[in-house]
Design a protein with these regions (language model features):
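Structural recognition of alpha->loop->beta junctions
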Residues: 217-236, 288-289, 293-305
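Boundary at the C-terminal end of the N-terminal hydrophobic targeting segment
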Residues: 21-27
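Bacterial N-terminal signal peptides that target proteins for export
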Residues: 1-11
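Residues at the N-termini of beta-strands
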Residues: 73, 226, 403-405
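C-terminal functional module detector
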Residues: 28-38, 53, 59-63, 258-269, ...
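Bacterial N-terminal signal peptides
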Residues: 11-21
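A metal-dependent hydrolase metal-coordination microenvironment
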Residues: 31-216, 220, 231-249, 264-267, ...
Length: 436
């Protein structure tokens, strides 16, 4: 058997059980996403960097920041590394580490901090995940999860993926194309999950970082059902530009083709902050924490429960708006906002009709750019079915929809946006609508 054929068969063999283990929400389901009957909304960040890679603060400082800000869970996702084993950081060689050490001394007792050497050879020991967990996690109140940013590339193009809930390092696999790089990393993570039984969720990070990944490249990947719809890093181009589709447009393109043509599950859209710069305070500058997150509905605050809820679509993504409930009864989708005083809300219901026009054209007249840009499709894809002013809105399903999703936009400006002019938003995950 050739390597290429083995690669083609591996996803089907390994992923079929996972794709059916936690079914996605669809029109066959009637469901209510609300904090009742022992279920809780849990706010978390799934993309975080510390001094273990290219973040500029210590992991215990980060964990304390998110806990103090009311988060229920945090995933550490340093580049190609886990917070394990003994590691010492040379302070003189790491720019800005003096600020981090000062904060460490302000927030923790002297016996917590381990130093050795003097002058240019002075080093501080980085605390491991287990040490930080023991210090800061609170059962059923605040959870820390070990993760990793699998940092791969194809040529000069970055291909980054976050693994949530992994105790073993997932080395980048490489691949023969952008799609193949993503697929091979998914295959490796799936094989690890099958072997260990640990629920590891892998999501594709910031597709517009370096404008590396198109909707067409990502939509084909088997087993990748999550990507970053909103990433708080100011250099990842969530909104795209005149040639590059924004991530929300990519989302609709991918789900339209995955459902109608590729027979793949829905792609869910995550909100993250991709925190790196914990001492930057100027609005819109640096990759600061707290710009975007997910809110997951689960009964228990444990890694497996969080991953299971995400895989089932029992969550929403946010850059500031909080939801009270999402209700679906098979014939209508209702969204209820946890409204703030003196703030107005607009709720849009968005989707694509079944039988949509799949034709497209290149986004550039330059032949060399044709395959590097998401193609231009008709407005039938990702069209707005209804727009409602107010904190509560309901859309009645007609039966023509392939899927339906909702986005809530607030009149309140994001206090620290990744892109200028952002309003606070919340994104309800898409629901596949079956044939009537």
């Amino acid at each position: 058997m050739t390597n290429n054929r083995r690669r083609a068969l591996l996803p089907a063999l390994l992923l079929c059980s996972l794709l059916s283990a936690t079914p996605q929400l669809s029109a066959q389901d009637s469901f209510v996403l609300e904090a009742v009957d022992g279920q809780r909304w849990m706010k978390g960040n799934m993309h975080t960097h510390s001094l273990w890679s290219d973040g500029d603060d210590f992991p215990e400082n980060l964990a304390k920041w998110y806990r103090d800000k009311g988060y229920q869970f945090l995933v550490f996702t340093d580049h190609n590394t886990l917070l394990q084993k003994e590691r010492w950081l040379n302070l003189a060689k790491r720019k800005g580490s003096d600020k981090a050490l000062q904060r460490l001394r302000e927030q923790w007792p002297a016996e917590w901090i381990e130093l050795r050497g003097t002058g240019d050879t002075e080093e501080v020991r980085l605390k491991t995940f287990d040490e930080v967990f023991a210090k800061l996690a609170v059962p059923q109140e605040y959870l820390l999860i070990q993760g990793e940013e699998i940092t791969d590339r194809f040529g000069k193009l970055p291909v980054h993926m976050c693994a949530t809930n992994t105790a073993e390092l997932l080395p980048p696999t490489g691949g023969e194309s952008i799609t193949d790089v993503i697929q091979q990393n998914i295959n490796a993570a799936t094989a690890r999950r099958e072997r260990t039984g640990v629920r590891t969720l892998v999501h594709l990070n910031h597709p517009n970082f370096g404008y590396a990944i198109t909707a067409e490249q990502l939509m084909k990947v088997v087993g990748e059902n999550f990507f970053e719809l909103y990433n708080g890093h100011p250099g990842v181009h969530n909104s795209g530009d005149e040639k590059h589709a924004g991530t929300e447009r990519m989302w609709d393109i991918m789900n339209s083709f995955r459902l109608q043509t590729l027979q793949l599950p829905l792609m869910y859209g995550l909100g993250t902050d991709d925190g790196h710069n914990y001492f930057e305070t100027a609005s819109g500058k640096g990759a600061q924490p707290g710009r975007g997150w997910v809110v997951v509905l689960a009964r228990t605050l444990e890694p497996d429960a969080i991953v299971e809820a995400l895989e089932a679509g029992r969550f929403y993504s946010s850059s500031g708006v909080s939801l009270q409930a999402v209700r679906f009864n098979g014939s209508s989708l209702k969204v209820e906002v946890q409204a703030e005083a003196d703030v107005q809300y607009q709720i849009q219901f968005i989707g694509t009709d079944r039988g949509f026009d799949p034709e497209s054209r290149t986004a550039s007249d330059k032949p060399e750019e044709a395959d590097t840009l998401t193609r231009v499709y008709s407005d039938q894809i990702g069209k707005v079915y209804a727009t409602v002013a107010g904190p509560v809105a309901e859309y009645r399903i007609t039966g023509k929809e392939l899927y339906i999703r909702a986005v809530v936009t607030s009149s309140k400006r994001h206090p620290n946006p990744s892109e200028a002019g952002e309003f606070e938003r919340a994104w309800v995950q898409p629901i596949a609508i079956n044939n009537p």
